[in-house]
Every structure is written in structure tokens, then in C-alpha cells.
Amino acid sequence: MTATSKSCKACGSETKVTTLGSFRGEEGPVAVIVNGMPALVCAKDHKRFLYPEFVTRLMDFVADPEKVAPQPPAVKRGLFKKRYHCSGCNAELPAAPTGKSERGLDASFKNATPFKVVVQVALHKCAGCGREQVLSNEEVAGSAFKAVAHGFRAADIHTDR
């Protein structure tokens, strides 16, 4: 962790590195839960990230579909009306999710104590072969990125304080 003390940009008081509790964000088929993330916190409970690049590193970390979702994803087919098909047997997948995948990840970034991130992703089970898969890696990545941003807002963590 960083040894230098910084003042709060909102109120001017000293900040200290504090381990936050759990916070959650959701977007589409993805939910992200962050547990024990370090942050700079002042006496008035204004929170900000340890350093400017911290937020982008965390968002990129959770937006990697190969880390957070079963692979390979479904295949999108159709000329006019696009539908998702199983990547294993080609059967059409149900439109509604049939299950959920939960992956626990250990986040370890420069100048920060390690913390836990849990990513939940909606799955679609193939009636033909039973394979569970996400519809799209692009959707998982985009939704995970937005979900963690919603979590930051819910926990009131800012880059500019």
C-alpha cells in the first residue's frame, strides 16, 4: 500500500487507506460484488480510489469474459432475426437465462492489498446437450464493466475526492 498520506479533495481532511466492506453492482446479465477493496477514506467518510489508474485496472479485470464466464459462448445466427445457438450441438438456446455462474477472483494490483471480486453471469442451458453458456462475450464484458461502475456509485467511491 502507499505510504504517502493524501488530503481529501472534498473537505481537505487527511485520508487513510481503509479496507471497504462489500458492495455490489448489476447490469444486464452480470452482477459484480467487491469485498475488502482498499480505498482512501477521510474522517467525513468521503471515499476515493488509491490512485487514478486503480479504477480502470479493476474495471478491465472484471470485464475479461474468459475469466468470469464459461467458454466458449453461444453462437449468434440468423439473417434477419438473430438467435443464439449452442456452441456445442447447434441447438437453439432459450431466450431467458436458466442458471447462473459465479466466479470468485482474487484482485491484486500495484500498491494495494489483495481483495476479492465475485462475478455472477446469467447462463443459458442447451436443451440438446446440457451445456451452459453465456450468449455473448461482448455482452458479458460490457455488462461487467458497467456493473462494477454501478457498484462504485452505490458505495459512493469517487476518483475526484
Task: Describe the predicted segments one by one.
Residues 1-33:
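Ordered, small/hydrophobic-rich secondary-structure cores
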Residues 1-4, 31-36, 71-83, 92, ...:
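Short, flexible, mixed-charge glycine/proline-rich loop motifs
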Residues 8-11, 42-45, 86-89, 126-129:
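Short cysteine-rich clusters marking metal-coordination/redox-active sites
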Residues 14-18, 51-52, 94-96, 134-136:
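Short, non-ligating residues that shape and space the ligands of small metal-coordination modules
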Residues 21-22, 28-29, 52-82, 99, ...:
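Short, intrinsically disordered terminal segments enriched in charged and Pro/Gly residues
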Residues 25-37, 100-123:
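Short linker/helix segments within small regulatory modules
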Residues 84-100:
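Short flanking/linker segments adjacent to small metal-binding domains or redox-active Cys/His motifs
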Residues 113-116, 121-146, 150-151:
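C-terminal charged interaction modules
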